[in-house]
Every structure is written in C-alpha cells, then in structure tokens.
C-alpha cells in the first residue's frame, strides 16, 4: 500500500468521546466547538445559524433570491420599516419538514443499498472461505502425496545407486573375464607353439623311423641272405665231409665257424640297435600321447571357461534386462511425478489466485476505509475552513459596515470569482487524486510483474538444475561408453593377434602341403605309411580346426555382443535425442504456458482496471453528489451572508424592533429544532459510509446526547463572540499555512509529471515486450517447421501447438481490443 496523502487537521480538534470505536473501522473525529470561545460569541453564532434556516432553500422554493433582492431594495429605500426585513426571508415549517422527510427517506434507501452490498460481500466472503478451506485440504492431501512421491524418488535413487554399484561390479567382473581370456589366449598361443614344435619333432622322428625301418628291412634281408648262406655252407660242409678228407674239413669248418661268429656278432649288434630304436620310438610315442592328453585337458579347461563366460554373459543380459525394467519403472515414476507436480502447480495457481482475490478484497476494504477517513477529514477541514471564512467575513463586514452599501456588487462579483477558483482547485485536487490512484495501480502492476519475474526465475533455476542433472547422467553414460569402447579396442587387438596366429598356422599348413608334395614324389611303398601318418596329422588338424572354429564362434559371439552394444548405444543416443527433443518441446510448452499465464494475468489486470474504472465512475457520481451538496452549502452561505446583512440592519434598528424580538425568539426556537434535525442528518451521512445497521442505534443515542450538548452550546455561543478576536489573529497564521500547502501542492504536481514520464517509459517497455513475444512466436514457427521434417509422429503435437498459437493470436487481438478500450476510457476520463 502506498502512503495516503495526509490532510491537515486542526490542532484543537479532539476526537469525540461518545462515539464508539469499531476494531475494523477508523475512529470518526467529532467537531466540537473551540474551547477558547466565550459564551457570548457562541450565542451569537447560534443566533446567526438559526437565522440561516429562516430563508427558503433554492431547490424547494425558487423565489428565494428575488425575495432577498426585494428586501434589500426595501431596506435601502425605507430604512424605518422593520416588517419588510423579517417577512421576506421567512420559510414555512411544513416545507422544511417535507424536505427533511424526503432527505431521511433518501438516506434510508442508501442505507438499505449499503446493507445489501454488505450482505453480498459477507456471502462472497463465506464462499471464499469455504473455497479456501477446500483448497487448503486439497493442498494438504497433495503435500502428503508429494511426500510419498519424494520418498519413492529417494528409494528409486537408492535403487539406481545400487544398480550403478551392480554395474560397476559387473564391469569389474567383465574386466577380470577379459584378463582371464587374455591369459587363456596367451596359453593358447604357447600351446600352439608347442604343437608346432611337436609336429616338427614328430616329422623328424617319422623320418628317422622311416630310415630305421628301411635299415631294418635291409638288415632283415641281409639276415635272410646270411641265413641262406649259412644253410648253403652247412650243405657244403656236409658235402665236403663226404668228399674231402677230415683235415680239410676241419680247416674249412674253422673258417666257416669264424665267419658264422662274425655274422652272428653283426646280427646281435643290429638286433641291439633295433631294440634301442624301438625303445626311442616308444618313448616318443609316449611323449606324444602325454602331449595329446595335455592338449585335451587344456581344451576341456577352455570349454569350461567358455561355459563360464556364457554364464556371465547370461548374467549380464539378465542384469541389463533388470536395468531396462528398472529404468522403465523410473520413467513411469517420473511421469507420475510430473503429472502430480502439474496438479500441484495447478492447485498452487488456484491458491495464488484465491490469495490475490483475498488481498484485493483486503486492499479494497482498506482503501475504502482510508477513503472514508479522507472524506471525513476533508469534510471536517472544509467545515473548519468554512467557519474560518465565516469569521473572516464577519470581521470584514464589521470593518466595512459603512462601505457595504456601495460595494455590494463588487463583493458579489468577487465571491463568484472565488467560488470559481475554489471549484477549479477542487477539480485539480480530484484530478491529482485520480492520477495518484492510477500511479498506485501502476505500482501494483509493477509489483505483480516483479513477482511473476521472480516465479519465472525460480522455474528457470529448477529447469537448469534438472538440466545439470541430465548433463551429469549423460557424462556418466559417456564414461561408460568410453569404457566399453576401450574394452572393444582390447577385444579388437586380441582378434588381430588371433588373426596373426591364424596366418602363421596357414603358413605352416602351406609348408606342410609343400612338404606333402615333396613326399608324394617319393617312393610308392612309403606312401602307405605316410598316409597313416597323414591321417594322424589330419586328425590333429581337424582338432585344431575345431579349436579354430570354436575361436571363430567366440569371436562371432563377441562381435554380436559388440553389435548389440552398438545397437544399444544407438538406441540410447536415439532416446537421448528424443529426450532432448521432448525437453525442448516441454521448454517451448512451458514458455507458451508462461505467455498464457502472462496474458491471463494481463486480462485479470484489465478486468481489475475495468472494475476500478467502474468504481471510479461510481466515485465520480458520489463526488458529483458531494459537489451538489457543496453547492447547496454555498447557497446557504450566501443566504447566511444576506441574513448577516439583515442582522446588521436590525442592530441599527434594535430600539425600534424590541416588540418583534419576542416573535423572532419563537422563530429562533423553531430554527433551533430544525438545526438539530439538520445536524442529525449530517451525522447520519458521515456515519452511513462506515457503520452498519447495528451501529445506527448507538448513533441515535449519541445524537440525543449531542442535542443536549447543542443546548449547552447555545448558552456558550455568547462566550465564543469574545474569542472571535483571538481567532482572527490565528487566521493569519492559518493563511500562512495555506500558502505552504499551496507550495506542497505544486511539488506534488511536479511529482505527478515525473510519474507520468515513468508511465510512458513503462508503456515503451510493454511495447518492447510485445515485440519480443512476436519474435518468440516467429521462432516457434521455425521450430515447428523443423519438427515436421524430423518426425512424423509429432504431427499431432504440432497441430496442438498451432491451436495454441491461434489462441495466443486471439488473446493478442483481445489484448489490443482491451488496449483500445482502455485508451478510449482514458480519453473519456480526461474529458471528464
């Protein structure tokens, strides 16, 4: 609330002691008589007021002005005729009673209308309280749901942390498996080298065996030849025994025995050599069998490791499936959270709207109270000013009694000029008040704009925090992807090593084939043996090929895993792109919502301004009524002046009018009664704007007490006449204060001009904001075109966006129409 302009109050104006103070209504200052006035002055003042009511009111009797002028002419022409002075300005009591009765009826009607408005406001208040209660209950429920969702979110975050730990454990297991695979590949390389060496040694041994077998065959052939020779020699010996003499036989027998010994020794030596070669062959075969057993054991180990790897892969797949399921649950929970947050936001918006309505009602009530206080203070100040002016005029009349008859026309002209000046001043005051109210409304609008900007900033901070969280998650995903890429690079290096080993094996096979071709060119009898050896080699090669096929299968599985990972990565990238697009769309939708909220707030502001304009028009009507009342008061003042002139004439002719004083005293009593009625009406008018029907009874009691006080004041009026001179001196001081107030008014006018300049600057800013909104709309159109090119599924959302843009355009047209209406209303206000 902006501070209201302070109205100067009289330093000797205490509050009325008999008026009760309501806790929600400001105290009404009572206007008692000045304590420094004497009884004589008070009595003279009462007499003058009583004489004021003797004249006819201009609205009830239009012939009052003519009668007053006729009495003046008669006084000028015949100063000795006292009847003309009293009979012309008399007012019938029946007319006064009718006027008072009509005035009371009008006041009662106004009271009834105010009572109805109060009842309507109380009904609205109860409805708003009920709506507030239900909204608070709903907010509490939503707070409970929000707490549950927050707890679920915390649980989900914990679960996500556990999943990350499980992922890290799986990654470590995968690293261990990779290391174990590397070790196995190294062992496999070593075994392949040993196989290669063993194959080479086998070939060498086979060659040696072939040579030894050839030698054995030669030895056996020689043995058979020797045996044949021995048999022939034995036959020869037998023949020789028969033919030759014994000496020759002995010599030949000795010679043959020696040859047999030598041949038998050679045979034994060859047999021993053959046994050695057989033993060596057996040892080599045993080594080969042992190596084959070792190879089989290693193959079994490799198969077990492959089974373990498969089990780990299955576990990985299961964990990945669990991760996907958990991620889907997380997404569903997040969607539920978004929906509930949207509901909470809607309820918060409703609560804010209700709070705004309450604040507006409270502000209206406070403004009405302040305005009523200001009106009362202004009325009191006006009453005091009028009294001061009356006193000044009385002083001037006393000084200018001798010159009044000559300066009547000039005085009337000056009074008219003063009245016009007063009216102009009052109009300027009303305009300044209207400007001040407009400024207050502008300041309120600024405050609302600041509040909206703060809300927008808070929302942007939330969005930025969410984006930072998303960026952190993306960085984590990228780190995981980098780890996967590193693992894939290691696997590729291993594959390259395998390819190199396979190339070496192929080179060895080519060498074997060349050697086979060389062996095929050899003898035919060796082919059978070689075929047997080749069968063995083919079996070994088949085993090697089976191992290679297993390695190929493992590599294919690894490639498939890599392809699956790549597909998963591509899916993740696509999902991230979709999420980013959805985030962009949500941001755009949030911007559109913010724009719609701004437009709604502007529409509400426009409605409030229209309501305020209606209130201002009502106030203008009330002000016109007040002006009419002031005009009536001025007419009464003119009549009072005429009556004062008559009183002065009567003072000159007091000795002649002593007989008619008694009649005037009777008339004065009637006028006193009428004055009491008028004062009651004035109090009712002042207290009707603030108090309700229940307080009217208290006011009536106070009015009765005031009537008693008025009677006491009639006795003290005479004392007030003595104090008039002292008050004349104070009037000069008050005139100086009036000059100071005029200077303050000029300063206020300068402030008003500055505020008008600020208002123009605000209008420029508003136009700039409208241009920005148009630029944003153009950007939205460009984004929509891009969205048409990117995805066909977003066509429905784009149609919705177009509908929202059409709504925005309609709202802009409505805003423009409202601006045109506001300008027209401002022009009307300026014309008024």
UniProtKB/Swiss-Prot annotation:
Compositionally skewed regions (Basic residues) per UniProt: 13-27
Bias kind Basic and acidic residues: ranges: 37-58, 92-107, 664-684, 692-832
Domain of life: Eukaryota
Chain intervals with Polar residues compositional bias: 59-69, 77-89
Transmembrane segments: none
InterPro entries: GOLGA6L (IPR026737)
Keyword terms: Coiled coil
Coiled-coil intervals: 163-828
Region (Disordered): 1-107, 303-333, 351-431, 508-652, 664-832
Family that this chain belongs to: Belongs to the GOLGA6 family.
Designated name of the protein: Golgin subfamily A member 6-like protein 24
Gene that encodes the chain: GOLGA6L24
């Amino acid at each position: 609330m902006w501070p209201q302009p302070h109205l100067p109050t009289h330093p000797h104006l205490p509050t009325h002691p008999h008026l009760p103070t309501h806790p929600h209504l400001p105290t009404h200052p009572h206007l008692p008589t000045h304590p420094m006035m004497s009884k004589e002055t008070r009595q003279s003042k009462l007499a003058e007021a009583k004489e004021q009511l003797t004249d006819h009111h201009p609205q009830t009797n239009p012939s009052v002005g003519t009668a007053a002028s006729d009495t003046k002419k008669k006084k000028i022409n015949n100063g000795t005729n006292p009847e003309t002075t009293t009979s012309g300005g008399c007012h019938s009591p029946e007319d006064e009673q009718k006027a008072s009765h009509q005035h009371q009826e009008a006041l009662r009607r106004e009271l009834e209308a105010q009572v109805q408005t109060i009842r309507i406001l109380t009904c609205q208040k109860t409805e708003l309280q009920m709506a507030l209660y239900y909204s608070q209950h709903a907010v509490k429920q939503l707070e409970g749901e929000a707490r549950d969702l927050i707890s679920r979110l915390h649980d989900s975050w914990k679960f996500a942390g556990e999943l990350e730990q499980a992922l890290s454990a799986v990654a470590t297991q995968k690293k261990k498996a990779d290391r174990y695979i590397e070790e196995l590949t190294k062992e496999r390389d070593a075994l392949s080298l040993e196989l290669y060496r063993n194959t080479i040694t086998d070939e060498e041994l086979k060659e040696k065996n072939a040579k030894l077998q050839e030698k054995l065959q030669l030895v056996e052939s020689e043995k058979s030849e020797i045996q044949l020779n021995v048999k022939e020699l034995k036959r020869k010996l037998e023949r020789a025994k028969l033919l030759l003499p014994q000496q020759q036989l002995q010599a030949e027998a000795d010679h043959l025995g020696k040859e047999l010994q030598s041949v038998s020794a050679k045979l034994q030596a060859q047999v021993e050599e053959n046994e050695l070669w057989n033993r060596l062959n057996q040892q080599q075969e045993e080594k080969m069998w042992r190596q084959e057993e070792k190879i089989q054991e290693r193959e079994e180990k490799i198969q077990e490791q492959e089974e373990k790897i498969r089990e780990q892969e299955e576990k990985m797949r299961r964990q990945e499936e669990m991760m996907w399921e958990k991620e889907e649950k997380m997404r569903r929970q997040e969607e539920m959270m978004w929906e509930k947050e949207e509901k909470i936001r809607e309820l918060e918006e409703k609560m804010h709207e209700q709070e705004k309505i309450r604040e507006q009602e409270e502000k209206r009530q406070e403004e009405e109270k302040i305005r009523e206080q200001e009106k009362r203070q202004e009325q009191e100040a006006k009453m005091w000013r009028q009294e001061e002016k009356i006193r000044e005029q009385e002083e001037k009349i006393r000084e200018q009694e001798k010159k009044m008859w000559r300066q009547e026309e000039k005085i009337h002209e000056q009074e008219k000029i003063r009245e016009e000046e007063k009216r102009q001043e009052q109009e300027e005051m009303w305009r300044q008040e209207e400007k001040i109210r407009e400024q207050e409304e502008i300041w309120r609008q600024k405050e609302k704009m600041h509040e909206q900007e703060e809300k927008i900033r808070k929302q942007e901070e939330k969005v930025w925090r969410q984006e930072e969280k998303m960026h952190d998650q993306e960085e984590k995903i990228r780190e995981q992807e980098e780890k996967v890429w590193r693992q894939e690079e290691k696997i590729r290096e291993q594959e390259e090593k395998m390819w190199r080993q396979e190339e070496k094996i192929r080179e060895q096979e080519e060498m074997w084939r060349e050697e086979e071709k060389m062996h095929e060119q050899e003898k035919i009898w060796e082919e059978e043996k070689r075929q047997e050896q080749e069968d063995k080699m083919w079996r070994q090669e088949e085993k090697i090929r089976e191992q290679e096929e297993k390695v190929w299968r493992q590599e294919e599985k690894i490639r498939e895993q890599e392809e699956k990972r790549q597909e998963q990565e591509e899916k993740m990238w696509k999902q991230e792109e979709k999420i980013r697009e959805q985030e962009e769309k949500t941001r755009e939708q949030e911007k559109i919502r913010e724009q719609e909220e701004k437009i709604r707030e502007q529409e509400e502001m426009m409605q409030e301004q229209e309501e305020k304009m209606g209130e201002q028009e009502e106030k203008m009507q009330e002000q016109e009524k007040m002006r009419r009342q002031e005009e009536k008061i001025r007419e009464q003042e003119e009549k009072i002046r005429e009556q004062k002139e008559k009183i002065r004439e009567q003072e000159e002719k007091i000795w002649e009018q002593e007989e008619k004083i008694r009649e005037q005293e009777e008339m004065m009593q009637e006028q006193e009664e009428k004055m009491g009625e008028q004062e009651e009406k004035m109090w009712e008018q002042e207290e009707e704007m603030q108090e309700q029907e229940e307080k009217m009874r208290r006011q009536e009691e106070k009015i009765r007490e005031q009537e008693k006080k008025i009677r006491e004041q009639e006795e003290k009026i005479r004392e007030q006449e003595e104090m008039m001179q002292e008050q004349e001196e104070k009037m000069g001081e008050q005139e100086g204060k009036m000059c100071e107030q005029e200077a303050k008014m000029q300063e206020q006018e300068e402030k008003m001009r500055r505020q008008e300049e600020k208002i123009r600057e605000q209008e420029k800013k508003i136009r700039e904001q409208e241009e920005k909104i148009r630029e944003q709309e153009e950007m939205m159109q460009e984004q929509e075109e891009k969205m048409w090119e990117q995805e066909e599924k977003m066509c429905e959302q784009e149609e919705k966006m177009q509908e929202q843009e059409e709504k925005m355009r309609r709202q802009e047209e409505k805003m423009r129409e409202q601006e045109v209406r506001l300008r027209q209303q401002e022009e009307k206000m300026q014309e008024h």
